[in-house]
């Protein structure tokens, strides 16, 4: 198993790196050049930089990921593609994407986009909390312990 992180706006990178390096599971952070950093990563953690274009990180993750790899993303489109490839996909708020819930998530995203396109406002996501982080940590640890 390898872990791929859609890292541009991922608030749990520290949890992923800490728990995965402890378990000696390789982590690849995929992020745009606009988030470039000289910071040295721990052993087993690689950062891949991609262009800042829309979905560039998603495409790179899909090129790299294999069946049963673990992917962390908040992007429903990437989650859908990764599920079709046989990957395990987690959201940073501590839930697992499944073939049962991805259709509803994509439909909700589409309907919200149509409402915004018509000029109306939609609610954004709730703020990320410490409780969300701990929920993610517990879920993540359960998958890397397998």
Swiss-Prot record:
It comes from the Bacteria. Pfam families: DUF188 (PF02639). HAMAP family: UPF0178. NCBIfam families: PRK00124.1 (NF001095). Belongs to the UPF0178 family. This is UPF0178 protein BCAH187_A3092.
